[in-house]
């Protein structure tokens, strides 16, 4: 996990320099320790609650094939976000879900009080096969199992939630979590998919009206809005309720919309992509984790958040399932973010 002192130090420097009180070069490590202790910064992060599936996946791509492996939206989000901030998880698994996986998440600072374990039932299972472009796929098998009758319960210890991340689930299940919050979170982020648009559009639009940020891919944005232009699509979706819309374009990056403003974050070009299954969820995990860590949900900070989300997603696709996310450390993340900075950093002079 990223060292909390490093992050606190960074925020202190950023705040003081932004007020023109000091130049960043004035600070040595010893001075930073004094500044941090004097400011007595406590509870740096906003409380993050993640809702979503924890599952088994079996995946086939043109470059390899996996047996039954750990997957699920909430799993990817938690593995990613826990690099930066504590996570409180809401999900459901069967008695066949490995205790070792639950223990590993707990060791990362993921609170599992909201995860229901149905010992006599089976965990949600999905199997899919990706085409050569790695953007389209065919579902080979879906077994809802415990997810079929999932009724999430928000524990009392989760009621301090400030950022709520709703992973892809039945829209009515997502909205039920919002209703259980005594105080509305400061930011509600929602992911969804085309399947719900095809079979329960009214329920989906109702849930969308309750959230602040909607995450969709480009084809879903067009289907939801009825517009081909992604700019027009985002505007129409914002009219449904969300203040912000993020349109994910896979290997081509992501777009962030707010009112009349647009921000584009590229995807890092990779030599090899083994499994894109959890990339969108990992992106979401990086996005909300940065907002929680910095306690800043402004549009300007969301720009940084989607860069971090893109960086984390670039790790996810390098191996099957959550494996790569379990291996990376703070130095890996810093190096990957630096690669993103170099990717888009340029000087231009008109002549």
How would you name each of these model-derived features?
Residues 44-60:
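Positively charged, low-complexity intrinsically disordered leader regions
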Residues 8, 22-24, 31:
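Short hydrophobic alpha-helical segments enriched in small aliphatic residues
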Residues 230-351:
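Conserved phosphate-binding/catalytic region of the ribokinase-like
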Residues 56-68, 83-165, 179-185, 334-351:
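Conserved N-terminal subdomain of the carbohydrate kinase-like
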Residues 182-187, 196-264:
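Conserved phosphate/ATP/ADP-binding segment of small-molecule kinases
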Residues 101, 173-180, 202-206:
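A short acidic, amphipathic alpha-helical/loop segment
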């Amino acid at each position: 996990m990223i060292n909390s002192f490093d992050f606190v130090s960074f925020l202190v420097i950023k705040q003081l320099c932004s007020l023109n009180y000091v130049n960043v070069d004035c600070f040595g490590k010893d001075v930073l320790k004094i500044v941090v202790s004097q400011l007595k910064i406590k509870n740096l992060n906003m409380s993050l609650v993640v809702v979503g599936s924890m599952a088994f996946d079996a995946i086939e791509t043109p470059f390899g094939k996996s047996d039954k492996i750990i997957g699920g939206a909430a799993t990817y989000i938690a593995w990613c976000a826990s690099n930066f901030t504590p996570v409180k998880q809401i999900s459901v698994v069967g008695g066949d879900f490995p205790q070792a996986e639950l223990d590993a998440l707990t060791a990362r600072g993921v609170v599992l009080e909201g995860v229901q374990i149905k010992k006599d039932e089976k965990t949600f299972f999905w199997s899919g096969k990706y085409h050569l472009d790695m953007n389209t796929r065919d579902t080979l098998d879906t077994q809802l199992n415990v997810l079929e009758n999932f009724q999430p319960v928000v524990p009392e210890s989760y009621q301090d939630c400030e950022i709520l991340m709703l992973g892809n689930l039945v829209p009515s299940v997502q909205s039920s979590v919002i209703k259980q919050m005594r105080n509305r979170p400061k930011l509600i982020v929602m992911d969804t998919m085309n399947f719900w648009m095809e079979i329960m559009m009214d329920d989906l639009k109702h849930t969308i009206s309750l959230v602040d940020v909607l995450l969709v891919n480009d084809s879903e944005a067009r289907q939801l809005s009825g517009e081909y232009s992604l700019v027009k699509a985002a505007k129409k979706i914002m009219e449904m309720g969300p203040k912000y819309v993020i349109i994910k374009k896979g290997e081509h990056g992501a777009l962030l919309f707010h009112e009349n403003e647009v921000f584009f974050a590229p995807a890092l070009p990779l030599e090899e992509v083994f499994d894109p299954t959890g990339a969108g969820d990992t992106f979401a995990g990086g996005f909300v984790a940065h907002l929680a860590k910095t306690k800043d949900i402004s549009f300007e900070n969301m720009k940084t958040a989607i860069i971090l989300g893109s960086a984390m997603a670039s790790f996810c696709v390098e191996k099957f399932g959550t494996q790569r996310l379990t291996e990376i450390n703070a130095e890996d993340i810093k190096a990957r973010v630096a690669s993103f900075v170099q990717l888009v950093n340029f000087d231009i002079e008109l002549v």
